[in-house]
Amino acid sequence: LSRKLNRKQQAVNLLLSLRQPHVNEWKKKVYNYIDNHADGEITQLPIEEIDKILGFYEFISIAVMNGTADEEIIKESQRYVYIRLYEGLRDYIDKVQKDEVSIYCHFSEHAKKWNYHRKMPSFVRND
């Protein structure tokens, strides 16, 4: 029981850390890029913010994978974010994984795992 409560508490702590102003700024810049890119606009890739936000979600994914954080809590609150980031940044993720296959691999796995048979928003590629 204690371990289960610890996993839930760790998940809550991770979710609270996502509310920090600097994390929200990273996410805002990345979402703006994703939205503009989906509309066909050519915009500069905010690489620093993308790497920071994907790195943050990779850390959360590792915590879920190794049982430190409760998967259901993370999935219920962040599933859409995982899918949106993964689908919106798939070209970038694929590019960096060509050089280093393990980069963002846990994040990518959770995004794919949690994206089960649901209608995706218009910004998502269908290939």
Model-derived features with residue positions:
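An amphipathic alpha-helical interaction surface
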Residues: Q44-D127
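Membrane-proximal alpha-helical anchors
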Residues: L1-A38
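Short, positively charged
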Residues: G40-I42
